[in-house]
Amino acid sequence: MKKSPLFSIFLIVLVDVLGLTIILPLLPFYAESLGATPAVVGMLVSAYAACQLIAGPPLGHLSDRVGRRPVLLVSQMGTFAGFLMLASARALWMVFLARIIDGLTAGNLTVAQAYISDVTTPENRAKSFGMIGIAFGLGFLIGPAASGYLAQFSHTYPILAAAALSLTSVLCTYFLLPAVAPHPTPETEQGRPSRWSAYIESFKDGKLGPMLWQFFAFTFAFSTLFSGFALFAERRFTHNGAPFGPKEVGYVFAFSGLIGAMNQGGGIGSLVKTFGEGKLVQVGFGSMAVGFALLSGSHQITFLLVAIVFLTFGSAVLRPSLTSLITSRAARHRQGMVIGLMQSLMSIAQIIAPLIAGLLIQKQYLSMWALAGSLFCAIGWSLIATTR
């Protein structure tokens, strides 16, 4: 395993995640300031995910054919353009357009995961994917806190900061990331099988198929949480007599990032060696289910933070373990295709979950919103036996 490309991709993912997490706690409040209801906020998040669904698989296939680095650069430049559009938005349609632009080019993390698969061995892959978990942890620690601080002065400042980070990510990829040889499919010269045929084959695989459904269940639960949490917290919690706003939500996300960084900081490799990836998937789903259940009944900040600990720990061990299991099962020349399929499943979950979350929160069904996340964790848990 080469350390220099892994360090470079870690740095790039970190900068990308910082931009994402700066936007995350702000976007619902930014949209509300332009007249959006919770249901419309859900539609906004879903529109971004729908564009990812359209663009994700082709980007994965393209990265298999031409290499990860060129596709990563195009994705990052699209994100930069989307953030600039968002910062200049003065009406809801401009916010939607900005998120659509970003969504259509949002292959950053997909291609980064494929790059990690290219430069690691199966034995070290889970630990290497844990680096993405560390990047997410650090991003959630720094980004939301910075967003909450900057939003006190103007809702535009955090978005401009995210745009600057996106431009930095482009420069890091161009100057720091070594190119790796593409992995075109062996059928290229004789005619490639269709994308849908490859997807169907993946779902028919006795072990890979259930793992893909587990990934969908995890992503649905995760999307339920992060698409609706800001609006949920605004209606459920107060600080100094005022409802939660971008600052408070940003600090809660930062707390989540701290827990995630503590769990991922060198710990995922030892946990995999001790318990195995399958066991960590089981623990992850269980921990997240408990966290959602606690969140459904919490009215005090203390219980909120306890719920966040369970949710963050669960996702921190589940995401890299399940991703490693899926990519290890896939043939080397189809790594990009399988990860593109995972991106599609993620996008489908991210289309549906925010719509449901927005409607539930608009109807003031706050506890039901949290229990929906717990339900999908239970579904993911129920699929564990079929993957053994």
What are these regions, as identified by a protein language model?
Residues G35, G67, S88-W93, G297-H299:
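Helix-breaking motifs and short loop linkers at transmembrane-helix boundaries and internal kinks
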Residues P25-A39, G228-E248:
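Short amphipathic helix-loop junctions that connect adjacent transmembrane helices
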Residues K2-K3, A179-W213:
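Juxtamembrane intracellular "pre-TM" segments in multi-pass secondary transporters
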Residues T21, A49-P57, G107, F140-L141, ...:
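Residue-level signature of mid-helix packing/kink "hotspots" within the transmembrane helices
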Residues G56-G67, N263-E277, I361:
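Helix-to-loop junctions at the C-terminal end of transmembrane segments
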Residues P70-M85, K279-L294:
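Structural signature of the two symmetry-related core transmembrane helices
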Residues A98-G137:
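Cytoplasmic helix-loop-helix junction between adjacent transmembrane helices
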Residues M131-F175:
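Helix-loop-helix hairpin linking two adjacent transmembrane segments in secondary transporters
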